[in-house]
Structure formats: C-alpha cells, structure tokens
C-alpha cells in the first residue's frame, strides 16, 4: 500500500485543527501509520524544503515552520498521495476548492495550515526525514475489506 507524509504546520496546530484534519483523512478511509508532535530543528526544516533554499521566501518559511509545534503524520492507502493532495487543496488558499482543508481553513499562502507530499518520490523522501523506520506501524484497519476491491 502507498504511503505519504502530511504535516500540520504551526498555524494549524495553534488553531486547534489537528483533530479535524486527522478525522477527515480517517473518514476517507486512509490509515494513520505514524504521528508525532514536534518542534522541528533547523536541519530537518532545511532538508524538508531543500527545493526552496534559494528562493526569496525561504527564510520566512523556515522561521514560520520553526515558530511552533508541527504535527507530523504518515498516512497509508491506495493512491494516497493524490487522494491527500486533493483533500488538502491548492497551495494558495485563494485557489483551493471549498471543502478542501485549505479551502475551509486557510486564507494566506504563507499560512496555509498543512503540507502534503506532492509525489510518491517526495513522500518517501519526506517520510525518511521525519520518521525512523521503527516509528511507522503496520496494521490492518477493520474496515479495509470494504474500502478496497
């Protein structure tokens, strides 16, 4: 089964949105296989956002991600990367569909509540940055037989 990385950013944690976000993914039928609340160290933030290192917004992004706790999650399911990206919505909340997480809970691209891996390759890389092998749990949800053919 596929896995992806999702992070509720400091604004989402501070606004009390973690439970709502987890509930949405669970209600969809995705399986939570890892989760933790952390203040991210600079090295992991830099590694997480390495493609943005040379961009002018990176210093602000780094400061923002390090400004408070983040809720880190590993989710599992068929086609989970694409499913989660649709549920999260467009990066710019002004363009996010109503009903998506960003469409419902974010107003500003610089405070857009949540990060989700954008490809299976990114998911594998990001999961490796934030979770050690033993931190992800393999188990079966009781409803899996009715979720998948």
Curated annotation (Swiss-Prot):
State if Transcription is listed as a keyword: no
Q: What GO molecular functions are on record for this protein?
A: ATP binding; metal ion binding; nucleoside diphosphate kinase activity
Provide the protein's localization.
Cytoplasm
List the cofactors.
Mg(2+)
What EC number(s) does the entry state?
A: 2.7.4.6
Instruction: Provide the residue positions that the database annotates as binding ATP.
Output: 9, 57, 85, 91, 102, 112
Give UniProt keywords alphabetically. Answer: ATP-binding, Cytoplasm, Kinase, Magnesium, Metal-binding, Nucleotide metabolism, Nucleotide-binding, Phosphoprotein, Transferase
Question: Pfam families in the record, alphabetically?
Answer: NDK
List the signal peptide residues.
none
- Active site residues per record: 115 (pros-phosphohistidine intermediate)
Which reactions is this enzyme annotated as catalysing?
a 2'-deoxyribonucleoside 5'-diphosphate + ATP = a 2'-deoxyribonucleoside 5'-triphosphate + ADP; a ribonucleoside 5'-diphosphate + ATP = a ribonucleoside 5'-triphosphate + ADP
- Leading EC class: transferase
Q: Which family does it belong to?
A: Belongs to the NDK family.
Q: Which PANTHER family match?
A: NUCLEOSIDE DIPHOSPHATE KINASE
Role summary: Major role in the synthesis of nucleoside triphosphates other than ATP. The ATP gamma phosphate is transferred to the NDP beta phosphate via a ping-pong mechanism, using a phosphorylated active-site intermediate.
Name this protein carries in UniProt = Nucleoside diphosphate kinase
Q: Which organism is it from?
A: Methanoculleus marisnigri (strain ATCC 35101 / DSM 1498 / JR1)
């Amino acid at each position: 089964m596929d896995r992806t990385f999702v992070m509720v950013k400091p604004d989402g944690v501070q606004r009390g949105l973690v439970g709502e976000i987890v509930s949405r993914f669970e209600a969809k039928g995705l399986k939570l296989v890892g989760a933790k609340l952390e203040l991210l160290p600079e090295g992991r933030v830099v590694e997480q956002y390495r493609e943005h290192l040379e961009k002018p917004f990176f210093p602000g992004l780094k400061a923002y991600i390090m400004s408070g706790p983040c809720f880190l999650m590993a989710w599992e399911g068929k086609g989970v990367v694409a499913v989660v990206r649709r549920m999260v919505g467009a990066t710019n909340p002004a363009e996010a569909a109503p009903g998506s997480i960003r469409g419902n809970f974010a107003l500003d691209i610089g405070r857009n509540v949540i990060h989700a891996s954008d490809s299976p390759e990114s998911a594998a890389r990001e999961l490796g940055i934030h979770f050690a092998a033993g931190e992800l749990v393999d188990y079966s949800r009781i409803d899996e037989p009715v979720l998948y053919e």
